[in-house]
Design a protein with these regions (language model features):
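C-terminal transmembrane beta-barrel domains of outer membrane proteins
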Residues: 86-238
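Transmembrane beta-strand segments of outer-membrane beta-barrel domains in Gram-negative
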Residues: 1-125, 182
Length: 238
């Protein structure tokens, strides 16, 4: 299977309040997507077009040791099919979904930090796979491969403890991830692991995570039990 998505987006963000200690913004984004999914070397597939508008409220508040950021939003869109061999027909047409993201950082001392995050989505209508909420992968439950579990509504959370390793630019991490897909065919995933982050201003950014499942080890995507999953991300900053 393979696929290609072209996304065109135009948006505006307006500050309502912005100080060092707190901020509040609202934004509106108009988005167009051309989506192509193929299997069997293109013999079967779908070609879809999506037009949507998204409105968000977001901001942060912080003091000496605490930092909290948040986003709430809603997406209204329309999905049309140009070619269809296997896409769910009830996902075609108008769709709506609501989103929320929360992120909290507590500075324990100069070297230790506690990071807590939670995100969620509620689909008010059936959603195409391109608009669904996924709870596995490098930015979700890291013990499972990308796309292991998804649906129109779900929750995802992470608790991560970080230790800065001197002035090397390295940070060691220990984490627990958990997520739930709700609705038809409820699915739960959880995992725990260790990681290493390298970050310096205008230099390379690197992130390595190793994770193992908590509870069920069976991967529907791979068709077998898994013991661990590793992720590596490298970014050159200029």
């Amino acid at each position: 299977a393979d696929g290609l998505t072209n996304t065109y987006e135009l948006g505006i963000a307006i500050p309502v309040r912005r100080t060092y200690a707190q901020s509040l913004f609202y934004s509106v984004n108009v988005r167009h997507r051309d989506i192509h999914d193929y299997i069997l070397s293109g013999t079967y597939g779908t070609e879809k077009a999506s037009d949507s508008i998204e409105g968000d409220l977001y901001g942060y508040c912080r003091d000496g040791r605490n930092s909290f950021s948040w986003t709430v939003g809603h997406v209204a869109g329309d999905l049309s099919l140009r070619r269809n061999n296997y896409s769910a027909p009830d996902a075609v047409g108008n769709y709506h979904k609501s989103l929320a993201d929360l992120y909290y950082i507590y500075d324990i001392d100069r070297d230790w930090q506690l990071h807590l995050s939670m995100s969620g989505q509620y689909g008010w209508t059936p959603l195409d796979s391109s608009e669904q909420f996924y709870i596995s992968g490098a930015d979700a439950v890291r013990a499972f491969v990308q796309g292991e579990a998804g649906g129109r509504s779900g929750l995802l959370g992470t608790v991560e403890l970080r230790r800065i390793l001197g002035r090397s630019g390295l940070t060691a991490t220990a984490f627990v991830d958990a997520g739930r897909i709700m609705g038809d065919g409820t699915k739960d995933l959880a995992g725990t692991g260790l990681g290493l982050i390298y970050q310096k201003s205008r230099d390379w950014y690197g992130k390595f995570d190793w994770a193992t499942p908590l509870g069920c080890h069976y991967s529907e995507s791979l068709g077998k039990d898994i013991t661990s999953t590793a992720w590596l991300r490298l970014v050159k900053q200029f």
